[in-house]
Amino acid sequence: MPAQGAPLRARIGFGEVRHKRLAPVEHAFAYPTCFLMLPLRSLRRQPDAVLARNRRAPFGFRDADHGDGRADSLAWLEELLAGEGIADADGEVWLHCIPRMFGFAFKPVSFWYAHRADGTLAAIVVEVNNTFGERHCYLLAGDGLDFGRMLSAAKVFHVSPFCETRGDYAFRFMRTDLAARDECGRTAVRVELHVDGSPLLLTSVSGRIEPLTRGAVRFALWTLPAMTAVIVARIHWHALKLWLKKLPIIGKPVPPELAVSRGRAPTAGATSAASTRPSPTRAERGAVENTASPAQDLA
């Protein structure tokens, strides 16, 4: 996917978010979702007429919802990568994020995929927001970075009052190739939180991807009109359920001094043919039991 090839189109995805807590009590939920998959370098060269960007609309995208709040979120991402010594992310940059609907958006987690000119992955940035208005990014890079490979990072950012700020995230990203301008595909992101060597939280977002069309936008507004508005409500609703299950509330720590923390090198031998495979099968999802309200409990 060369940066100067034919511009790629914005995509929209429809799927499901899933979450399961394993200890000290079990708690699980799943909700339908829609999301955007935006080729930001292509959109910089040729804006998409269907995408309502940085303007009022029932369904759209606002750059200021990401990064440091500037009007060009791609410029922020490029500066972040340059500051971290990643100089070869010269291909497409895809942003997987929740849309802004009817003027509202809360984005617990977004995923930035920065490619080289030959289409390989140079870096993945996991951008996490909490309900206190704070934001932190986990940068995943290094030799062997690829779809389908298990990646990891130490948890340093507070998200849930029912989870301590410790442990390790295990990430696995799967996505079909979107190099063709009008290609459909599938994506799946799985995130596990391990504490003291045992899994505590299992989350995922997966779904089908298709070109962003006016018909697809109408379908999203018709089937999920209140999706972005109820994300925060669902977070508090499930927090109440956990409190009723007698889970102790953990005080909010001071946020990390650095806005970006680096993950570990990809796990050797953890890649598979799933690197470009569609989202997990029902059996795979059942085995992992992931879910999240776009993952506020990326906790």
How would you label these PLM feature ranges?
Residues 1-299:
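Mature, function-bearing regions of proteins
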